[in-house]
Amino acid sequence: MEGKTVILGVIIMSLVMAQNQVEAKICCPRTIDRNIYNACRLTGASMTNCANLSGCKIVSGTTCPPGYTHDILQNYGDAVNEYCKLGCASSVCGALTTLKNSMQVNCEGAVSQCTNACSNFCTKGSAKVVETA
């Protein structure tokens, strides 16, 4: 039971962290700066610290300022949602798959629920609104 609680806690924490990445856009002056930002974020550092380290800027709109044309998150319709779902499922739900494969644990239902949660989280429930409209 404790293992399920830990997994659920990690999933919720990851989804909250992913929300910040979806709502903000990172603009960088060069590709190398974007790569530095990405590597920094992989260490678990905050968006602000990584932006300061790499020379990138965090913007709330959809357009990067002049000179910062190398953006991380391109906002082209459903591309953002698909990127979110793919990233969420691979990073959060991948741990469940690894657990299943390495420890012979039956967590097929948990993996399915995890991918559904990622989908709902990334679309912010907009699919349900469309279905009921």
From Swiss-Prot:
| BP term (GO), one | defense response
Residue span of the signal peptide, if any?
A: 1-24
Subcellular location per the Swiss-Prot or TrEMBL entry: Secreted
What the entry lists under SUPFAM superfamilies is as follows: Crambin-like
Its keywords, alphabetically, are: Disulfide bond, Plant defense, Secreted, Signal, Toxin
> Where is it expressed, tissue-wise?
Expressed in flowers.
Q: Which GO terms describe its molecular function?
A: toxin activity
InterPro entries to which the protein is assigned, alphabetical: Thionin, Thionin-like_sf
Residues making up the propeptide: 71-133
Domain of life of the native organism: Eukaryota
One GO cellular component this record assigns the protein to is: extracellular region
Tell me the disulfide pairings in this chain. Answer: 27-64, 28-56, 40-50
- So where does this one cross the membrane? none
Q: What does this protein do?
A: Thionins are small plant proteins which are toxic to animal cells. They seem to exert their toxic effect at the level of the cell membrane. Their precise function is not known.
Entry's family note? Belongs to the plant thionin (TC 1.C.44) family.
Protein name in the entry: Thionin
